[in-house]
Curated annotation (Swiss-Prot):
This is Microtubule-binding protein TANGLED1. It comes from Zea mays. The lineage of its organism: Eukaryota, Viridiplantae, Streptophyta, Embryophyta, Tracheophyta. It is found in: Cytoplasm; Cytoplasm, Cytoskeleton; Cytoplasm, Cytoskeleton, Spindle; Cytoplasm, Cytoskeleton, Phragmoplast. Residues 375-386 have a biased composition (Polar residues). Residues 170-180 have a biased composition (Basic residues).
């Protein structure tokens, strides 16, 4: 079920509101109460007239012929009877359709109508009107209480407290400011006194300062990048034993051969000792034997190994630049030589001259092509015989 919006069917709501306002009018309510009281009095008069007795209502003895309403109604009945009986009234007779023209018809019934009957008719009519008004009041009251469902209005947003409204945080800040101002006045006289406890609690101290570090001069101990360090101070993960005492003693003339100084000059990481002329970066040496390293640690020098001298490589005979050119077999070249025998002779002579090496024999290391030379020789011999 969807709730109706407040603006749905405004005409019907306006009419219901007007009816409720008219029904709940205080002046109309007072008039209705008075009318109901009169109806009750008339009903009591009718009851007394029919019964023929006297009743006491609210301590007052009422006679059927003593009320003002009874006297007024009885006067009207007498006037109507005189009008119907008199001669003048006979000429001005009512039309036949109203009371009936017959002597023994409704006219006789009207004459026989008594005063209690007239009182009863008026009382019933007023009771019907009062009951209808009471129903309207009940309907209006029920409609007021049973309103159709409406969309609830949005709740107002909680506004922030104004500057003047006291909050616990504002009160605390005001006390802190007041204490801070009061302490600032006496700060010049007594600078050694610490601040108040509440003020210290409210302040945030990110980095506590030790009293020892206050007196010392500040020393910057920033980390140095390894690439900016000198060569000797760089950490070596896997130290090379060939760079220890032998390298430094050979390259540094000022280095002393005493083992104690050598041990002192070595670093904890067993990295090479800084020398005046550092060894080359890509210099690779074969590591010494285990016995030699033990003797070196004890300070004893070993005789140097004789360097193994290998025989020099044989010098190959250099080929002539004419023969280094590769001569491959090609049908087009062969056809060209067949067409021009002079060129074939020249090329054949060149090949013969170049085929002889320094010692008069063929050159070693070059691939000989006997098939091509044989073919060229046979072709040239045929051409010369012709």
């Amino acid at each position: 079920m969807v709730a109706r919006s407040p603006n749905a069917k405004p005409d019907r709501q306006k009419a219901a509101a007007l009816a409720a306002a008219a029904a709940l009018n205080p002046a109309l309510l007072r008039e209705t109460l008075k009318k109901v009281d009169r109806c009750m009095a008339r009903l009591q008069e009718l009851q007394y007239t029919v019964a023929g007795g006297a009743k006491v209502v609210s301590g007052v003895s009422l006679s059927p012929r003593s009320t003002r309403g009874y006297l007024r109604t009885s006067l009207r009945c007498k006037q109507e009877t005189v009008r119907m009986r008199g001669g003048a009234s006979a000429q001005k007779r009512s039309p036949s359709g109203k009371f009936g023209g017959g002597v023994g018809g409704e006219g006789a019934q009207w004459r026989r109508m008594s005063l209690p009957a007239m009182l009863l008719g008026e009382t019933v009519l007023e009771i019907v009107q009062a009951s209808q008004f009471a129903r309207d009041i009940v309907t209006a009251a029920g409609a007021t209480n049973r309103e159709p469902p409406r969309t609830p209005k949005p709740a107002p947003r909680t506004r922030k407290p104004a500057a003047g409204e006291p909050t616990p945080l504002r009160a605390r800040r005001a006390r802190e400011k007041q204490s801070h101002r009061g302490g600032a006045a006496t700060r010049g006289a007594d600078a050694a006194t610490p601040p108040s406890r509440s003020r210290v609690r409210s302040r945030i101290q990110f980095k506590p300062v030790s009293p020892v570090a206050v007196g010392r001069p500040s020393v910057s101990a920033n980390r140095v990048s390894p690439k900016n360090r000198p060569w000797a101070k760089k950490a070596v993960m896997f130290p090379n034993p060939t760079f220890h005492a032998s390298t430094s003693a050979a390259t540094d003339p000022c280095a002393t051969p005493s083992p104690s100084k050598k041990q002192k000059r070595l670093y904890k990481t067993r990295s090479p000792v800084a020398a005046r002329q550092t060894p080359h970066k890509f210099l690779v040496k074969s590591p010494p034997s285990a016995l030699g390293s033990k003797l070196r640690m004890h300070g004893k020098a070993l005789p140097a190994r004789p360097a193994a001298v290998s025989p020099p490589p044989p010098v190959k005979a250099q080929a002539s630049p004419a023969k280094t050119r590769r001569c491959s077999f090609s049908p087009s070249r062969l056809a060209t030589r067949l067409m021009s025998p002079i060129k074939a002779r020249l090329s054949l002579g060149r090949s013969r001259d170049s085929g002889v090496g320094v010692g008069g024999g063929p050159m070693s290391g070059l691939k000989q092509r006997p098939g091509v030379s044989l073919t060229v020789r046979t072709v040239s011999s045929k051409i010369s015989s012709r």
